[in-house]
Each structure stands twice: as C-alpha cells, then as structure tokens.
Amino acid sequence: MKSIGLNLSGREYKILIGSDLLSETATLLREAIPCDRVVVITNIDINRIYGKKLKKHLESKGIESLFLELPEGEIHKTLDMAAHIYPQLINHFAERNTPILALGGGVIGDLSGFVAATYQRGVPLIHLPTSLLSQVDSSIGGKVAVNHGGVKNIVGSFYQPRLVIADTGCLKTLPEKEFACGMAEIIKSAAIGSSELFRMLETNTQAVKDRSPEVMEDIISQTAAIKAGIVCQDETDRGIRNILNFGHTLGHALESTSSFSQSHGAAVAIGMCFAARLSVRLGLCENETALRLEKLIADFGLPTNPKDIDPDKIIEAMHHDKKVSDGRIRFILLKRPGEALIAENILKPDVLSVLEEMK
C-alpha cells in the first residue's frame, strides 16, 4: 500500500493506494474517524459488485451502515438528486459525526461530496473510488458539485475528504470504456506535470492496457501525487491549480452541448488535443509535442477529434464555464510534455480556426 499525504492549512488527510483495500475499510476508517455508524452512497452497478461484501465487512467490525443506491450517470448529478438524499439521512438520524462514504466513480464522489458538505453544514466525507478516473482525479482535492441548467459542476464548493481509499483491485471489473476515461486524466497529469510519467506511458502502453497491478499502482500513485502537490499549493483553484483543467475548457463544453451523453474522459481527451493544436498555432509548443500527445491518447482508445459539433455553440458553452474570468475564456496550453501554462487573452478566431480544423 502506498500513502500520499495532503496538508491544507493544517488540515491533513491521506490517499491510500493498494490492492484489496476495501476489505480493510473499517480499520482504515477508524484510524481517521472513530465511528460505529456510516452512510454509504453508491450506484446500482457498484452496489451489485461491492455493496454486499462491504456491508458484511463493516458489520463484522461493529459498524452499522445505511446504503443509498442511486441511478447511474452524469445526468443524475443534480440538486434534485441531492434533495432526494437529505430526507434519508434525516430518517436515519445521521449526525454531524456520521461519515458519508462515497463508493463509486466521479459522479458518486461529486454528489456525495456535495451532500456531505451541505448536510448539517458538513459531515465527514470518505472517498472509496472504484473507477480509474476517480482514483486519480475526482476523489482528490475537495471539489464537490452538481450540474444545473445544463451546465456542468456549476453549483458546488470545496470540501476536503477525511480519507481516500483507492482499491486498485476494483480496476479488474472496470469496463474498457471506463478504464480509457481514467487514462485520459492520467495522460493529462503527465502532460502538465511529469515528462517522466509521459514517457513511461508511451513506453509501457501495453502493460498499462493489460492493467498490470504493479504498473497500475505505480502510475496511479504518480498521478495522485501530481494532483496532490498542486492542490496543496492552491486549494481553491485561484492560481496554479488551474493547470489541472488542461483539456477541460473544451471538454466541459462538449459534455454540456451533448446533454452529458459524451463521457468526461472522451471529452477531456478531445479537449487536450484541441489545446495542444491551439498551442502549436500560437507558437507555444512544437508540432511534434502535439502529435505525441494525440498518439498517446489514440493508443489508449480515446478520441482525438469531436464529431458533429457547432463551433459557435461550443464557444457559447465555454463562456458558461467556471474558468471564465472577466468575460475571458481561460485555456490551459501546452509548452512541452510535463509543462503547461495558463492563457486568457486567446482570440476567438484562433479558437474557431482550430475547432474547424478538428471537425
């Protein structure tokens, strides 16, 4: 098991990464929060695979558990779904010291975190991420949010978990499409923060695709450490943390304009290719860098170009993004593998030109 610590203005928590950690949940949980009762928020598919085993494990250690099973999908990450959860917490007599365990992927983590942050002004949050994307990205850093009015993550806050338990054994049951989505975030982290990880992904593509336990634990740990290091410098996303949004400006617009039928990982993959091409157009990086990134993305079965887009609608969606400041769309652009920069004064014709090239 590997452990990564985050220290945020005196508030500390750990990200634990290893195989079969779900079977140690009770012990690891009690090391962070003394408790004898928890609420587990999950979805139908994850509950079917892990719910019964986790519930039995918790009960064997004297921890009473209420499992709340939600429908699957980004479309359900809403205020209405949060409002559906609150009465169940009240009826269960959940108190301010009753932990909420988020068992699932990014949608469950975001929604559970939003509920934990707002129920009784905040209850302990524990992430049990089961998807690759959530293990390397969404469970780390404290962003919690729901979608509203067709805009992704527009209602939310920063609310740090007390513990993250990333069981790499969960990746064995992860569908190929979901695995690829997680790889998009790993590639993103390598592109902005580690040329060594970028090269490792290029030279060990097949071992990663085969989900070699040793390789996966290594790259998950490296990716988590990159994000943790950035979050510790800028918890509330006012400065350097913005570089974690590489690929997300276009990515979120693609998700929103598709009514969230476009997966997050695929959208971010396309967004990274767009950002790299825009970087080349602006003379910020070599064309070879963009080509290497596109090849790596394609090698993991992710798309590099959008389908059936209306560039004007994409631009409009970008203006609704949280990253807009003083009416200016903020882009994260690439200089070379492992180094990115924040850019705001990008001209609309340049954006439209690259979008047209990618159609």
Swiss-Prot record:
EC numbers for this chain: 4.2.3.4
Residues binding NAD(+): 72-77, 106-110, 130-131, 143, 152, 170-173
Query: Which domain of life does the UniProt lineage start with?
Result: Bacteria
Principal EC category: lyase
Q: What is this protein's function? A: Catalyzes the conversion of 3-deoxy-D-arabino-heptulosonate 7-phosphate (DAHP) to dehydroquinate (DHQ).
**Keywords, in A-Z order:** Amino-acid biosynthesis, Aromatic amino acid biosynthesis, Cobalt, Cytoplasm, Lyase, Metal-binding, NAD, Nucleotide-binding, Zinc
User: What are its GO cellular component terms?
Assistant: cytoplasm
Respond yes or no to whether keyword Disulfide bond is given for this record.
Answer: no
Q: What pathway is it annotated to? A: Metabolic intermediate biosynthesis; chorismate biosynthesis; chorismate from D-erythrose 4-phosphate and phosphoenolpyruvate: step 2/7
Question: Which Pfam families does the UniProt record give?
Answer: DHQ_synthase, DHQS_C
Q: Which reaction does it catalyse?
A: 7-phospho-2-dehydro-3-deoxy-D-arabino-heptonate = 3-dehydroquinate + phosphate
Q: What is this protein called?
A: 3-dehydroquinate synthase
**Localization of this protein:** Cytoplasm
GO MF terms listed in the record are: 3-dehydroquinate synthase activity; metal ion binding; nucleotide binding
In terms of InterPro entries, this protein maps to:
Dehydroquinate_synthase, DHQ_synth_AroB, DHQ_synth_fam, DHQS/DOIS_N, DHQS_C
Entry note: cofactor: Binds 1 divalent metal cation per subunit. Can use either Co(2+) or Zn(2+).
Per the similarity annotation, which family is this? Belongs to the sugar phosphate cyclases superfamily. Dehydroquinate synthase family.
So which cofactors does this thing need?
Answer: Co(2+); Zn(2+); NAD(+)
